[in-house]
Amino acid sequence: MTDILFGNNNRPVLKLLTKRSLKAQKNTIAVLAIMLATLLFTSLFTIAISLQTAMQESNMRTTGTSAHAGIKRLSWEEYEKLSSDTGIKDIGYSIIIGNAVGDDFNKTPTELRYGDETYAELIFNTPDTGHLPEQKNEIATSRIVLDAMGLPDKVGTQMELTITTDTDTYTDTFMLCGIWDGDAVAYRQTMLLSKSYTEQVAPVIHGETDGTTPPVGTGYIDAVMMMPTAWNIEKQALDVTSKYGFGSMSIL
């Protein structure tokens, strides 16, 4: 553009300003595109993590444990070998006792076991009220079981219970010492009894097992394990259990 009075030609200046403006706009668009792409990938990553977490939680609720792996029907000596293996980060055990019988349990199948603290924690049986059984006739269980029995969720509550094992039936009175919520999705509920009572009615199995056990498995040990990492859990667990020839291992 030429100024008539002064003879100035502004066209080159205008072109330069226009180019700078377009370049600035392109840079702004590029920055916005990067921001949107970052937001998109972050959202997708968050959704993927959320879905994985939800699937893991659902699987844990169904199997009834947060453990990486478990192995069933061991003798005490077999468990000792397994628990001393350096390929296992943490391990807990339970001793199978039997099943609760009676009308209260027709719709709420309930098993009875002794479990150590690690086992109780990994199968979501750590009491939020009270404690795990210590005295001989103490018992801990879920609010789901107490509701099925028509009992209050109050520590100190007395209950009469009939238990069937592989070889006998026992009816005893227990005092409630620990309570947790329980999960209705679990395939069965659990009652935990003291070690001294368990030794009386379900002495632990010793020696070498051959893979054949009676229906209930009274006296046998179930173990739950945490591996060093959550990567390729099945291989880690198999590497450990194969050393001892255990064939009943289940990946959880």
Q: Model-predicted segments: where are they?
A:
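N-terminal Sec/SRP start-transfer signal
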Residues: M1-L39
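Basic-flanked hydrophobic alpha-helices used for secretion and membrane insertion
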Residues: A48-L252
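Alpha-helical transmembrane segments
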Residues: K23-T28, L32, L36-G64
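A near-ubiquitous, low-amplitude feature marking generic local secondary-structure context
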Residues: I4-L5, A30, I34, T38-F41, ...
